[in-house]
Each structure stands twice: as structure tokens, then as C-alpha cells.
Amino acid sequence: MTGQDGEPRERVDVFLTGLAFLDIVFTGLDSPPVPGTEIWAKGLGSGPGGIANFAVALQRLGLTTSLAAAFGADLPGDLCRQVLAEVGVDLSRSRRFEDWTTPVTVAVPYPGDRALITYGDPPPVSQDDLVGQPPASRAALVHLAPDSGAWIERARAAGSLVFADVGWDPSQQWVPDELEHLRSCHAFLPNADEAMGYTRTSTPAAALSRLADLVPLAVVTCGADGAIAVDGTTGESASAPGLAVDVVDTTGAGDVFGAGLTAATLAGWPLAERLRFAVLTSALSLRRPGGAMAAPGWDEIAAWWTAVRHTDDTALRRDYAFLDDVIPLRRSDER
């Protein structure tokens, strides 16, 4: 181990920990690769992935972030750390390990589907060892792991709203015990397959109902169909339909959704507006390759809203009218 980067910030908007990857995305394929042949992609994107998607997306929405993640002493790790530092993510609680390889994912989207290939070893230290005492923060965001418990409870006790998600279970066993750390969490943000798998239900709505018994804010993302949520702290329930965009790459879209929801929750918006905003940020990220690096900032959100206001889609203008009050303030903050 070669240590940490810089002096820790005393307080941030959002603290994050989990597994970081270097994502490499090939786009513009007309069909999936066929063994024994070579095909050329029309587009290429790369950048930090995994938990880093959340950090970059939050920074672009104007929130300060601190990330505790392991990086190898290798080119993928150095590239990830460089990009994260350039966008303003605090890496003082991240560590660089000499004898560990930074995970790498290659994403190959093509019409109607995509394929992912990942290389990586288990993290060299536990989340609790990596985090130690989490910094003061308004929110904390975690990829749930068996060793997440202690630091999550410390963050919650210190006043942070803890937002959690899970990764895909390649065994598809979906062991419910893996959700035990949700007792210390404010929100849980699985996709529909994950939610139904862990709750042993057959519809996203049924899964949401079960998850609402476990956390104050339960959210299920449903891909192109949008998202549904229940907030037990306010008694609100809401759904938000997906938005029609020209999809280039879906890598990291769920993470960008989580960042949008976190930012909107910290802003104190009603649940329906939080959900719509998260769907919007996720949808805008689909238009470019590269996961984290495709996450929108306020200028891109403002450009989308300007275009919508000049259409005859009255339902869309009504649903997103709240942006009229939000965008001028946020863009002013950026300057």
C-alpha cells in the first residue's frame, strides 16, 4: 500500500464507498461480436466506473463528495484517480495498493442488449477498514457488502442519510441476509431484477411494497419504464415514466439515477419531483458513452428543459415545470 491522497475534508455533502472500476465502452456496434471475427466500433468511451459513477454524477450536480475506494498501483487505477481528482472528488480516504489490480469492465452495447466483461480480484481491505471514521456528511452512499455494517451505523449515528444499492448477483441466489445492513440505511435503490430477486416477488410493485418495510425511502428502478418509490417519512408514493432519448450506452445509468435522487432528496423536494429528476439525469446520461463521464451537469439539464418548453408535450412540460425554479439557482451556484 502506498497510502492516501491529500488531507481529508472535514465535511462534505456526500461520502461514498464501494468498488471502483475503470470502464471501457465500445459503442455503435450493429450486432454482437461473433467468435472468430473482428468488428469495429463507431464510438469509444472510458472513465471511472462502479461507485465512482455516483461521485462524478454528484459533483456535476454541484455537490461536494469524498470517496473511499481501493485503487491498484497500475495504469487503470492511476487514470481513475486522475479523472476523479480533476472533477473535484476528494480522494483523501481512498488508498493505492501495490499488490492489487484495479478492476476493469469492458461494456459492449449493441441494438437491444449489451454484454459486460469484468476482470478484478476481491478488495484488498474491508469497507470498514478502508473507511474508518467516515467524514461528517449530509448523506452517505454505499454499495452494500458483507463488511459494510459498522461504518454505516457510525455514519447514520452522526446524522448522515445513508443511501444504499446492491450489485448484480451472478449466482442469482439473491440471499435476503445480504440486505441486513439496510436497518441503518435511509434509502435503498435496487433495479427491478434485484428488487424482485431479493424479495422473492414477481413484479416491481410487489417488491417495492416489501422493501418499504425495510427502509424509510424505497425506490425500484425499471429501466426504460422509469421508477417507482415510497417515502415512509412523508407518506408519499410516486412513479415517474421513462424519457425518450437516443440511447448510445446504458453503462452507469442506474448510478446516475441514484446521484440525481440523492441530490434531490438533500434539496428537500417532494417525492414525485425527486423521482422525475433522477429519471431525467439518468436518461440524459444514455446519450453518450462512458458511464460516469456521461453524467449531466446543470447546463445540459437546462438545455434539455429549454427544448422541452418549446414542444407541444403538455404532460412533459407539466411534470418538469419545477425545473423553472431550480435551474437558475443551481447554475448560479456553479458560477
Which residues does each predicted region cover?
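Glycine/charged-rich beta-loop-alpha catalytic/anionic-binding loops adjacent to active sites
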Residues: 32-42, 88-90, 234-245
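Conserved phosphate/ATP/ADP-binding segment of small-molecule kinases
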Residues: 156-161, 167-239
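Conserved phosphate-binding/catalytic region of the ribokinase-like
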Residues: 1-15, 204-335
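A glycine-rich helix N-cap at a beta->alpha junction
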Residues: 83-100
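Glycine-rich phosphate/adenosyl-contacting loop at the front of the ribokinase-like
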Residues: 1-70, 75-78, 316-335
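Conserved phosphate-binding/catalytic loop of the ribokinase/pfkB sugar-kinase fold
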Residues: 96, 105-146
